[in-house]
Regions:
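Charged alpha-helical initiation segments
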Residues: 1-52
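Substrate-binding/catalytic groove segments of enzymes
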Residues: 138, 147-161, 180-189
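Short non-catalytic regulatory patches outside canonical folded cores
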Residues: 59-141, 148-153
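Short amphipathic alpha-helical surface patches that serve as generic macromolecular interface elements
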Residues: 140, 144, 170-173
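Amphipathic, Lys/Arg-enriched alpha-helical patches that create a basic surface
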Residues: 162-205
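Short helix/strand-bridging catalytic loops that position acidic/His residues to coordinate divalent metals
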Residues: 38-43, 153-165
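Acidic, Ser/Thr-rich low-complexity intrinsically disordered segments
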Residues: 200-224
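Short, hydrophobic, well-ordered secondary-structure elements
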Residues: 23, 30, 44-69, 170-177
Length: 224
């Protein structure tokens, strides 16, 4: 097994398998709350736990993706969405805008209007900022409210832990799914191989074949 294949198998065991475990926990909550947009504001302790776990994993994977494309980037503990958001925007912009279908009926685009750019400040240091017309995902901002001040009331008078709801959780899961699938596709392409990893139970990526008007479904990026 060469180095590229090792990177692929490491990703599957360290990241993709963990996603599937989180997804299994989410799937088990359907016994109590139907997966339906009518329940978008439903919140619970289980959703709170999963929301924080999924968003934390997005942060971890985002840094991994940036380090993969720019090995000089080192994770030191102070990096945030501005840093890895720049890497994701630069190297995977088209991929992350792909719509995701949840339980075959709910279409999500969690990275819509997402984009960061790098600029040099007056001292010549690289800084990161949102590109014109782009914005930080609302579900990510809500995650930070939950993470840092979950018992504090927001401007609407509601306690922040209520932001750990069905809508935000599905958006976060879809966001992680998109990153995982397309990064896995990158690793497969670099290794010039296909890895038959286990498929998601709840999420499917839809893409448009440039040579066809038909939409196709994809559960593994490497299958494109």
């Amino acid at each position: 097994m060469d180095e590229k294949e090792k990177q692929l198998t490491h990703f599957v065991s360290s990241y993709w398998d963990y996603f599937l475990e989180l997804e299994n926990e989410f799937a088990s909550t359907q016994k109590y709350v139907a997966f339906d947009v009518c329940n978008k504001n439903t919140y619970s302790i289980e959703y709170l736990k999963l929301f924080q776990a999924v968003c934390s994993e997005i942060d971890v994977l985002g840094k991994e993706i940036l380090h993969h494309f720019e090995p000089e980037f080192k994770v030191g503990g102070f990096e945030n969405i501005k840093h890895w958001g720049y890497g994701v925007s630069k190297y995977m912009r088209r991929s992350i805008l792909t719509p995701v279908t949840f339980v075959e009926k709910i279409e999500l685009t969690p990275w819509k209007k997402f984009g960061y750019e790098s600029v040099l400040d007056k001292n010549g240091y690289k800084r990161y900022r949102l590109e014109d017309g782009c914005e930080k995902p609302k579900w990510w901002s809500d995650y930070n409210h939950v993470k840092h001040a979950r018992t504090t009331c927001g401007e609407d008078g509601k306690v922040n832990y209520q932001l750990a709801n069905f809508s935000n959780l599905t958006q976060a899961f879809a966001a992680l799914f998109v990153l995982e699938q397309h990064y896995m596709g990158v690793l497969m392409q670099e290794a010039d191989t296909y890895y038959a990893a286990r498929e998601s139970r709840l999420f499917v990526i839809e893409y448009v074949d440039p040579d066809s008007d038909d939409k196709k479904e994809m559960s593994l990026a490497g299958a494109v």
